[in-house]
A protein has these predicted regions:
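Outer-membrane beta-barrel "beta-signal"
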Residues: 200, 225-239
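Transmembrane beta-barrel strands of outer-membrane/channel proteins
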Residues: 35-41, 67-71, 96-102, 118, ...
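Repeated loop/turn-to-beta-strand initiation elements of outer-membrane beta-barrel proteins
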Residues: 60-66, 89-96, 126-132, 167-176, ...
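Gram-negative outer-membrane beta-barrel proteins
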Residues: 39-45, 64, 73-77, 88, ...
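Short glycine/proline- and aromatic-enriched beta-strand/turn motifs that initiate or cap beta-hairpins
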Residues: 19-73, 238
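Residues that define the transmembrane beta-barrel architecture of outer-membrane proteins
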Residues: 29-31, 46-52, 74-78, 102, ...
């Protein structure tokens, strides 16, 4: 991941040297509303729970924002994400991304996560694109049973991700993501998460998709510990 991230940064810097090829803002905005249903399975493949989520996003290519929440039995998640990355030579985007996440387990604990750092994307504008990010990661947790003695627990950490997206035909997108976090799950570095997914666009305003999310605990500093997977079905509306 470090080598790929470095290569992307090197090429983006070369393009950045030509200021005429930089676009700082696109006025056209694409808004989407996505609703999903997720089934979580444990490492023995037994189903643990189901969850529903909804997310709104606004994308102007260089400037994007999205926010959503996820509900499970006794668990609530909220995430907001913003990114600004000027377009360089039509193919590269380099900028800053920030993420804010709140997770509450009813009567057990709550936590707040904040990530901010460098974001890179390369898009061929035809069939393939790759994006990557490296972030400072701040986590703050409050355990209700000991809150009178230890009000808060803090941690300063690191987060990374890389995603490949392939569009073999016009309306079909396939993607793979390897990261230390997901949109609603933020573990300390490095508990890898591998996501495989696809989305088919039936019309200009609606598409359906499916994702398989395989989760591990501490794959690299200890022996790999498979922690289960999530299977998510979603519908996306564009307007």
């Amino acid at each position: 991941m470090k080598k790929i991230f470095g290569i992307l940064l090197f090429f983006a810097f070369n393009f950045f040297c030509d200021a005429q090829n930089i676009n700082f803002f696109t006025s056209k905005i694409e808004k989407t509303l996505t609703g999903g249903l997720t089934f979580r399975h444990l490492s023995d493949f037994s189903m643990e729970n189901a969850a529903a989520d909804i997310c709104f996003s606004a994308d102007m290519k260089e400037l994007s924002f999205n926010s959503g929440f996820k509900l499970r039995s006794g668990i609530f998640d909220f995430t907001a994400q913003a990114c600004y990355a000027p377009t360089i030579a039509r193919h590269f985007n380099v900028g800053i991304m920030s993420i804010f996440h709140v997770n509450v387990y009813s009567d057990i604990f709550s936590e707040i996560d904040f990530l901010t750092g460098l974001y890179l994307k390369y898009d061929t504008l035809k069939h393939f694109k790759i994006s990557s990010g490296i972030f400072y990661f701040y986590k703050e947790a409050r355990i209700f049973s000991i809150a009178d003695k230890i009000p808060r627990i803090y941690n300063h950490n690191l987060a990374k991700y890389i995603e490949f997206c392939f569009t073999p035909i016009q309306n079909l997108s396939l993607y793979m993501n390897l990261a230390s976090y997901t949109y609603y799950r933020y573990t300390l570095y490095f508990s890898p998460d591998l996501k495989l997914g696809g989305e088919y666009r039936f019309s200009d305003w609606v598409s359906l998709g499916n994702e398989w999310d395989f989760q591990y605990i501490d794959m690299f500093t200890l022996s790999a510990n498979y922690n289960g997977f999530e299977n998510r079905f979603f519908v996306k509306l564009r307007f």
